[in-house]
Regions:
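Secondary-structure boundary elements
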Residues: 1-60, 68, 135, 145-161
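Hydrophobic/aromatic-rich core segments of domains that either
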Residues: 17, 32, 64-147
Length: 162
């Protein structure tokens, strides 16, 4: 899901070359470039949408932004991973959707988060559920069904400050 193709590489070329001494500057510029080039549009992609497909479509959701960021960071030899979880919405306790963001490993700092969809770095409102190489490794819920029976999965999440 995070292999860079021509469209992801085109985004990478628009960001100034990473300074080995200041990778955070590059990563913030990369995050902003992805947000500018790939419009957030709910419902336009799925869990199997690749970074390249989202970049080619020019639209996606948080997981697509994270996949593109991860592909680009890795192309610059910066370790990056996918994070799935929840973002506490200030106007409600009950959360209606999962959220995704990316993290890059910076020497001396460790894993640094980038929420490309919202244009910010994660803060205490973010609840991490899983990390992995991509969505498939960090999906909040996975499973398999055999047979033709109907089913419904319901998940209720409440996130509140203590």
């Amino acid at each position: 899901l995070t292999k860079p193709g021509p469209k992801v590489r085109a985004i990478i070329r628009e960001v100034p070359e990473p300074n080995k001494d200041e990778p955070l500057e590059y990563l913030h510029a990369l995050s902003a470039m992805i947000r500018d080039r790939v419009e957030y549009q709910s419902g336009c992609s799925g869990g199997d949408t690749t970074a390249e497909e989202a970049a080619a479509n020019g639209k996606g959701v948080c997981q697509d932004h994270a996949h593109i960021f991860i592909a680009a960071a890795r192309a610059a030899d910066i370790p990056a991973r996918y994070v799935s979880g929840y973002l506490m919405m200030n106007d409600r306790v009950e959360q209606v959707a999962t959220h995704a963001w990316a993290e890059a490993h910076i020497d001396g700092l460790g894993w640094v988060g980038f929420d490309i969809a919202n244009g910010i770095s994660p803060d205490p409102r973010y609840v991490r559920v899983a990390t992995g190489l991509d969505y498939l490794q960090a999906a909040p819920v996975t499973g398999m069904r055999i047979g033709g029976a109907d089913e419904t999965l319901r998940v209720d999440i409440e996130v509140a400050q203590q």
